């Protein structure tokens, strides 16, 4: 499934290429990759990178860091924003360092009174980041310079089958965020899956 280069937003391409020239891994990610593969015009473009929010800000003077728990970089091109996030690992799979004094956000579990500890800014690899996403069709990365789709979550076969499928156990994923049920229905209807 090739992605036509002329359909890629030039400002998103600038962000990816500047990050790459500075030594960071950087890819288009998520809905824009899905839409391009389906021959649809993406409503926006997102970038995922190995650069941390401060490293992103140092490269782009038109950048603003947003979010408290989940830090993102918004890179402005006029009225357009290219949302740029750092690859993240699943916080439950990462052991915090023993000397880490950073505060943890404690969240009450839903229904079973379990206490969940969530550290949303645990940085990871591109593969770990893909596995954190909601659906396989949104977990696709696109390497601009290599002109290849990176699929660590079996999203390409699901696109071909026109299937919306969670990454991981659906019961767990929907309990983590019940809004995902609505998103699955929305994608299914909007994409005619």
Regions found by a protein language model. Name each.
Residues 1-193:
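Catalytic cores of the polymerase beta-like nucleotidyltransferase superfamily
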